[in-house]
Amino acid sequence: MLTSVRPADVVLEIDLSAIQANFQTISALVGPQVRVAAVVKSDAYGLGLVKVAGALIDAGCDLLFVGNLHEALLLRSSHISAAVAVFCDEFARYGEHYRSNGLIPVVNNSVELDAICGAREPQAYFLNVETGLSRLGLAFDDVRRRYLGGIFKRRPPSVVLSHLACSERAGDAMNLLQWNRFRATSDLLKPTLLSLAASAGVWLGKRYHFDMVRVGSALYGLNSAGIRPNPLKPVVGVKAKTLDARNVARSEAVGYGATFRTGRASRLAIAGIGYKHGLPWACANKISVRFAGYSAPLVGRVSMEYITIDVTDVPEALCGPGTNVELLSDDFTVDDLAASAGVHPQEVLTRLGVGCARQYLDGSSASAGFPGNLTNAGPGHDPRAILG
């Protein structure tokens, strides 16, 4: 009978104090008159919803945005009492769960708006309006028609929000176009509070801040707007273990497809991390890792559970079986890894969060993904049971 399991060999280290510092940086940027809401959807971008939410509340955050009702109920079952808004889930179906748990639905279409306004009890809600992303939200004509019908006088939204499509590019004409559309729509709903900017949008200037900004990726150290020098603290590191090391001759092929051949007699180390853990397949032959400060290139393709590293110039005592391999650090961040692979940093972060064992710098740990975190829920409060 198996009674114990050795610790995970691939660890995602998460610095909660860095998340708090990034929250304070954004708060200082927008000023005290602008509310900073934290976006913790998708399990806090893979970093652990409950842990991250608690750290943000300790830093002064009083409003959290989650992706769905499942996440909202997980927060409530974990005794998170801050205001929680749900980006997208069925109020018409789950209205009682919203009301009994003090949750705020984001209304994205006319069906949801009718359900809100037709409810016997008043329900606070945020109204999402479509300004150019072509994803979710009421179009201007729908808002105007409902305005003329008096629905917003009877049940006004607490906040009107929209989402910028091109905020990572400060000079893109879409930003001003969406600002003008948002302003035209929101003018119908005065004096409702307004929110347009997310993480990259906060760097577009005060006119985009309105009453509230919704910050996600910036909290987790991602500099999607490319601000230099980067004012955000790195939040995560990734470490794996060396499994084996071997000497090979010059001109030997390495990995699937023989995409790399040794240019000299070389020593190669095999580390137990691959695309299963969230390391992008496309970073093959493009990045370097570290052994106790020594840099060594990844050579050959990224496999499902392994990578190969040229450690010829690393002292053997530092790169033998069982030694640590550092893939992400303050010097080589998620942004850098994503750029090397030609993918979005948010994709890299969320995949690492699912594929690696999380370890928080306060010494605690958590399993990746929701099933492990649901152990925080009290008896009878499993969100999966509530929602069926």
From Swiss-Prot:
GO MF terms held by the record: alanine racemase activity; pyridoxal phosphate binding
Q: Which UniProt keywords apply?
A: Isomerase, Plasmid, Pyridoxal phosphate
Positions contributing to substrate binding? 135, 304
Q: What does this protein do?
A: Catalyzes the interconversion of L-alanine and D-alanine. May also act on other amino acids.
Organism in which the protein naturally occurs = Mesorhizobium japonicum (strain LMG 29417 / CECT 9101 / MAFF 303099) (Mesorhizobium loti (strain MAFF 303099))
SMART domains registered for this protein in UniProt: Ala_racemase_C
UniProt entry tagged with the keyword Isomerase: yes
**Active site as annotated:** 41 (proton acceptor), 256 (proton acceptor)
Residue list for modification N6-(pyridoxal phosphate)lysine? 41
Its recorded name reads Alanine racemase 3
